[in-house]
Amino acid sequence: MRYLTAGESHGPSLTAIIEGIPAGLTLHPADIDHELQRRQGGYGRGARMSIETDQVQISSGVRHGKTTGAPITLTVINKDHQKWLDVMAVGDIEETLKLKRRVKHPRPGHADLVGGIKYHFNDLRDALERSSARETTMRVAVGAVAKRILAELGVDMLHHILIFGGITITIPSKLSFRELQERALHSELSIVNPKQEEEIKTYIDKIKKEGDTIGGIIETIVQGVPAGLGSYVQWDKKLDAKLAQAVLSINAFKGVEFGVGFDMGFQKGSQVMDEITWTPTQGYGRQTNHLGGFEGGMTTGQLLVVKGVMKPIPTLYKPLMSVDIDSHEPYKATVERSDPTALPAAGVIMENVVATVLAKEILETFSSTTMSELQKAFSDYRAYVKQF
């Protein structure tokens, strides 16, 4: 399985092409639209999400509600493009129009300046448009297809926010996977403690009035992945490493942890390692899950626990100082539409990116020309692991 995305933030549309999806997977536009709507939700989202009502168009690879095994083409129309026809025109236009909405005051923390240097841009909008988080629309669309594969194999997942702009969420003890999932899904903030909702909403409103932004830490948990996905035999075969790269490729993500993560640096080996158990009914297990479901770059059969840290959005309504790329004089950075926080949306993106990596690994590991073939191979492997 592989995919490419294309499109600009204010261009006519966004596109993804996915190759390697088994034939016979039940797939409808509504499956993808559901995930796209989740991405657009969450408290703190700004004006752009009130303009766009993202809906996917599937133009290849699916017929009568089933995948055919051919490449799948997904497209999402940018409604806001109608206001940017001159700025984003494909053909050559008058010089005066080219200067319309030209970006020459790069934003600290964004790709504007370095992108302009790398690709020799006189207008930094050429970097801004592609590097925008709008691209993650298609990452979610691809992830929605991946989640359909995982669902057919009994793999489920959730995400929730652990830290919201410096406010640590108190996680109620002994919540099951399903309880965590339900609480997060029914929260505008993707948190599992409803008692903290108003405190955080008030804080977001305060940040918005200040023209500032906040980041935080997101946790994605996956249930139903058997032991043995990934490999230790080469550095690039390790599944946790693949997940780390994918999560860090999401806009504004700056760090990844598995299990208790960086807290391991403060603990002894006897406190961190997960003792191995065995029962006739369950097979092998672990007393704890400090390592987040990974050993040697391979899944252990425990819950996969992946955490990602998102920096505050770099576009500020009270912009920081920058430099004019023409005169090299100090100027305030360019202001584009922005949100005080995008953590709930980023959680949806992270969840779908993790789903994509896991689906890809499964498709590469098991015979998967058709879904029925994949389901049998996956089921047989589960049975093997249980009796090992």
Swiss-Prot record:
Reactions listed under catalytic activity: 5-O-(1-carboxyvinyl)-3-phosphoshikimate = chorismate + phosphate
Keyword presence, Flavoprotein: yes
Binding site for FMN: R130, S131, S132, N251, A252, G296, K311, P312, I313, P314, T315, R337
Any single GO BP term: amino acid biosynthetic process
Keywords: Amino-acid biosynthesis, Aromatic amino acid biosynthesis, FAD, Flavoprotein, FMN, Lyase, NADP
GO molecular function: chorismate synthase activity; FMN binding
PROSITE patterns: CHORISMATE_SYNTHASE_1, CHORISMATE_SYNTHASE_2, CHORISMATE_SYNTHASE_3
Family affiliation: Belongs to the chorismate synthase family.
Function: This reaction introduces a second double bond into the aromatic ring system.
Entry protein name: Chorismate synthase
Taxonomic source organism: Streptococcus pyogenes serotype M2 (strain MGAS10270)
